[in-house]
Curated annotation (Swiss-Prot):
Biological source species: Phaseolus vulgaris (Kidney bean)
GO molecular function: DNA binding; DNA-directed RNA polymerase activity; magnesium ion binding; zinc ion binding
Key word Transport present: no
Binding site for Mg(2+): D491, D493, D495
Keyword Nucleotide-binding: no
Taxon lineage: Eukaryota, Viridiplantae, Streptophyta, Embryophyta, Tracheophyta
Uppermost EC category: transferase
GO CC list: chloroplast; DNA-directed RNA polymerase complex; mitochondrion
Subunit-structure text: In plastids the minimal PEP RNA polymerase catalytic core is composed of four subunits: alpha, beta, beta', and beta''. When a (nuclear-encoded) sigma factor is associated with the core the holoenzyme is formed, which can initiate transcription.
Designated name of the protein: DNA-directed RNA polymerase subunit beta'
Length: 684
C-alpha cells in the first residue's frame, strides 16, 4: 500500500470479508465475475491443463503463458480497445502471465470458521476480548458446547441461559430430536448457537470503548484491594495476574480502535486462496510432479466444505449431529491450513512428513519475510565476514578489492571510457578482469565520493544498517571499527555483513546526512550512548593502563619482596630505591621513542616530567623519602610522583611515575578532546 506521503509500505492485519472479496474477484470483459474456487482439483491428468474453477484455474488466476488462453489461442498483448481481451470459449483473458503471482482467489465457506491465530495462539485475542476461559471457547467452536442466544423481550421456548454441555444426559436424547423435528427450525436458530457462529455473535455485540472503560475501572479497584504487608501471597498473585490481563485487554481494544478493525473479522466466512505462483506444482525428471503442501491443505478444505454444502442443501433429511460434525471437520481443516499442529498433533502425509502450513511458510528464519523479502539478494550488493579494523575512523570501513571491483564495476567502466583508457564497454571489462593498475586508481577515485551501506541481519532497529566511507583493504574480509559493533549487535567471531551501494542521488544524500555511523552515537530507543567500548576493547584498555598501581610501594615496601619472614637480617643494599634504576624522561615523545627502540618495555615504570599542578603544590601529603644532592637540591619522593626542589625550597619540577601504556592512552584522549574542541569552534 502507499500512504499519503507516497511511501510504499506493508501492513499486516485483519480485513473485512468485503475487502477480501474485492481483492479476489475479477470481472471479465463479458461481465462474468470470477474468483471463487469451488473444485479441489489442480491439473487434468491427461492434458496437464488447469482444471476449471480449481486451484490453478486460468479464468480465476490468469493465463499460464502470456497471451495464450486455455484453448491454445494466441493474442498479442496490446493496449488497443478494439482487440479482443479474452477468449469467448474458455473465458481466459489475454494478459501477462505475471498476474498469477499476485492474483488471489477465495473459498466461500459453508459455515463460519474462527481464525486459529486469534483463538489458539497465546495469549488468545478472542478469549481476551470476551473475558472467557480459552477452554470454554474452544469447546464452543468445536461443537462440544452450545450457547444460549440472548432473546430480548421475547418469550423463550427452551429457557436456556449461558453455555451448556451437549453431552449432559438430559440433553443427549432430546436435542437431536429437537433439531430434526419439522417446524422447529425457527426456535432452534433463535435460541441455540454453537460453533464459530456463537463466537461471532458475541464479538459483534462488543463495544470496545466500554470494554476499555470497564477494564480501567476494575484495574483501579484491584489496585486498592492489595493485601497489606503481603499477608496473603496467593491473593496478591491472583490480583496481579488479573491486573496484567486487564492491561492486555485495554491495549488490544485500543489497537482495534486505532486500526479500524472490527472484532468479528476474527471469524472467517471467506478463505483467501494464495496466487498459484506462490504454491507451485513442478514437474521433475521422470514425469513426476512436486506440489507445495499448501495445495494439499487447500484441497482438504474444499473437499470438506463441499461435503458440508451438500449436507445443508438436503437439511431436511440430514441429522443435526452430522451437520455439527461436518462443521467441526471444516474448522479443523482451516486450522491445519493456517497453522498445522497448533497446540495439538500436526497433520502428516503418507511418508510421515509434517505438512508445511501457511504459518510455517512465513515465520522463522527461513520464512517468506526474513529469507525471501528481507534477506533476498539484490543488485549492487555483496557479503563477507567482518574483522576488526582498529586503525579505521569511526565513519570508515575496509572493503576488499575483490568486492569493490564488482560493486563499482559500472562506475569503473564509465571512468575508463571517460578518461579514454577504453573505447567501449568490452575493452573496459577486459581491463577490469586483468586488474590493470589504472583500474585501481580509478576505483580509489570512485570510492572517495561514494558511501556504502553495511547491514547485519536481523535488522531489528534502524542502527542495524549504517553508512560508511569505504577504503580498499587487502584480504577478503570487511574491516569494521569495533565501536560500531553494538548498533549491529555484531562481534568478530565469524559474523557476516552485507554491503550495499546506494545508487540514486536521494539515497546517497540520505546515507551521508542521516545514516553515517559517526552521526548515530546514541540509541534511538533510550538515548544512551551506543558507541561504547565492549569486550576485547575493554580488555585492551585494562592491559594498556594496568601498569603498577601501588607506585613505589610495590618494590620497596612490598612484604613479599622482603625476607623478614624468618627474622633474617636484611642487607642495606636491599633498601635501594629500585633493583633496576627507573629512567627519567622530559616529555612523552622521548618515552615513546625509547619504547620503540626497545630500551624499555610497555609496562616498565618510568618518571615523566609533568607540568606544575596546583593540587600537588597545595597538597599536605608527607613524602615517603627525601634524596639530597650535592648541589643543594633535593627530591621529595611520594607514592606516584616526585618533586624536585631548590635550596630555597622552591618547586622546580614535577615527575610522575607512569609507563608507556598510560602515556599512549593519555595522548589519544588529549588528541580526541582537542579535535572535538576545534570542531565545536568551527561550528560556532
Amino acid at each position: 500500500m502507499i500512504d499519503q506521503y507516497k511511501h510504499q509500505q506493508l501492513r499486516i492485519g485483519s480485513v473485512s470479508p468485503q475487502q477480501m472479496s474485492a481483492w479476489a474477484k475479477r470481472i471479465l470483459p463479458n461481465g462474468e465475475i470470477v474468483g471463487e474456487v469451488t473444485k479441489p482439483y489442480t491439473f487434468h491428468y491427461k492434458t496437464n491443463k488447469p482444471e476449471k474453477d480449481g486451484l490453478f484455474c486460468e479464468r480465476i488466476f490468469g493465463p499460464i503463458k502470456s497471451g495464450i488462453c486455455a484453448c491454445g489461442n494466441y493474442r498479442v498483448i496490446r493496449d488497443k480497445k478494439d482487440d479482443p481481451k479474452f477468449c469467448e470459449q474458455c473465458g481466459v483473458e489475454f494478459i501477462d502471465s505475471r498476474i498469477r503471482r499476485y492474483q488471489m482467489g477465495y473459498i466461500k465457506l459453508a459455515c463460519l470458521v474462527t481464525h486459529a491465530w486469534y483463538l489458539k495462539r497465546l495469549p488468545s485475542y478472542i478469549a481476551n476480548l470476551l473475558d472467557k476461559p480459552l477452554k470454554e471457547l474452544e469447546s464452543l467452536v468445536y461443537g462440544d458446547v452450545s450457547f444460549a442466544r440472548p432473546v430480548v423481550k421475547k418469550p423463550t421456548f427452551l429457557r436456556l441461559r449461558g453455555s451448556f454441555e451437549y453431552e449432559i444426559q438430559s440433553w443427549k436424547h432430546s436435542i437431536p430430536l429437537f433439531f430434526t423435528t419439522r417446524g422447529f427450525d425457527i426456535f432452534r436458530n433463535r435460541e441455540i448457537s454453537s460453533g464459530a457462529v456463537a463466537i461471532r455473535e458475541q464479538l459483534a455485540d462488543l463495544d470496545l470503548r466500554i470494554i476499555m472503560d470497564y477494564s480501567l475501572i476494575e484495574w483501579k479497584e484491584l489496585g486498592k484491594e492489595g493485601s497489606p504487608d503481603n499477608e496473603n501471597e496467593w491473593e496478591d498473585r491472583k490480583v496481579g495476574r488479573r491486573k496484567n490481563f486487564l492491561v492486555r485487554r485495554i491495549e488490544l481494544a485500543k489497537h482495534f480502535i486505532r486500526t479500524n478493525i472490527e472484532p468479528e473479522w476474527m471469524v472467517l466466512c471467506l478463505l483467501p486462496v494464495l496466487p498459484p505462483e506462490l504454491r507451485p506444482i513442478i514437474q521433475v525428471d521422470g514425469g513426476k510432479l512436486m506440489s507445495s503442501d499448501i495445495n494439499e491443505l487447500y484441497r482438504r478444505v474444499i473437499y470438506r466444505n463441499n461435503t458440508l454444502i451438500d449436507l445443508l442443501t438436503t437439511s431436511r433429511s440430514t441429522p443435526g449431529e452430522l451437520v455439527i460434525c461436518q462443521e467441526k471437520l471444516v474448522q479443523e481443516a482451516v486450522d491445519t491450513l493456517l497453522d498445522n499442529g497448533i497446540r495439538g498433533q500436526p497433520m502428516r502425509d503418507g511418508h510421515n512428513k509434517v505438512y508445511k502450513s501457511f504459518s510455517d511458510i512465513i515465520e522463522g528464519k527461513e520464512g517468506r519475510f526474513r529469507e525471501t523479502l528481507l534477506g533476498k539478494r539484490v543488485d549492487y550488493s555483496g557479503r563477507s565476514v567482518i574483522i576488526v579494523g582498529p586503525s579505521l575512523s569511526l565513519h570508515r570501513c575496509g572493503l576488499p578489492g575483490e568486492i569493490a571491483i564488482e560493486l563499482f564495476q559500472t562506475f569503473l567502466i564509465r571512468g575508463l571510457i571517460r578518461k579514454h583508457f577504453a573505447s567501449n564497454i568490452g575493452i573496459a571489462k577486459s581491463k577490469i578482469r586483468q586488474k590493470e593498475p589504472i583500474v585501481w586508481e580509478i576505483l580509489q577515485e570512485v570510492m572517495q565520493g561514494h558511501p556504502v551501506l553495511l547491514n547485519r541481519a536481523p535488522t531489528l532497529h534502524r542502527l542495524g544498517i549504517q553508512a560508511f566511507q569505504p577504503i580498499l583493504v587487502e584480504g577478503r574480509a570487511i574491516c569494521l571499527h569495533p565501536l560500531v559493533c553494538k548498533g549491529f549487535n555484531a562481534d568478530f567471531d565469524g559474523d557476516q555483513m552485507a554491503v550495499h551501494v546506494p545508487l540514486s542521488l536521494e539515497a546517497q544524500a540520505e546515507a551521508r546526512l542521516l545514516m553515517f555511523s559517526h552521526t548515530n552515537l546514541l540509541s534511538p530507543a533510550i538515548a544512551d550512548p551506543i558507541s561504547v567500548p565492549t569486550q576485547d576493547m575493554l580488555i585492551g584498555l585494562y592491559i594498556l593502563t594496568s601498569g603498577n598501581r601501588r607506585g613505589i610501594y610495590s618494590n620497596r615496601y612490598n612484604p613479599r619482596n622482603c625476607r623478614n619472614l624468618k627474622n633474617e637480617r636484611i642487607p642495606n643494599n636491599n633498601y635501594k630505591y629500585t633493583k633496576k634504576k627507573e629512567p627519567f624522561f622530559c616529555n612523552s615523545y622521548d618515552a615513546i621513542g625509547a619504547y620503540q627502540q626497545k630500551r624499555i618495555t610497555f609496562d616498565s615504570p618510568l618518571w615523566l616530567r609533568w607540568r606544575l599542578d596546583l593540587r600537588i603544590i597545595s597538597s599536605r601529603e608527607v613524602p615517603i623519602e627525601v634524596h639530597y644532592e650535592s648541589l643543594g637540591t633535593y627530591h621529595e619522593i611520594y607514592g606516584h610522583y616526585l618533586v624536585v626542589r631548590s635550596i630555597k625550597k622552591q618547586m622546580r619540577s614535577i615527575y610522575i611515575r607512569t609507563n608507556v601504556g598510560h602515556i599512549s592512552f593519555y595522548r589519544e584522549i588529549e588528541e580526541a578532546v582537542q579535535g572535538f574542541c576545534r570542531a565545536y569552534s568551527y561550528d560556532i
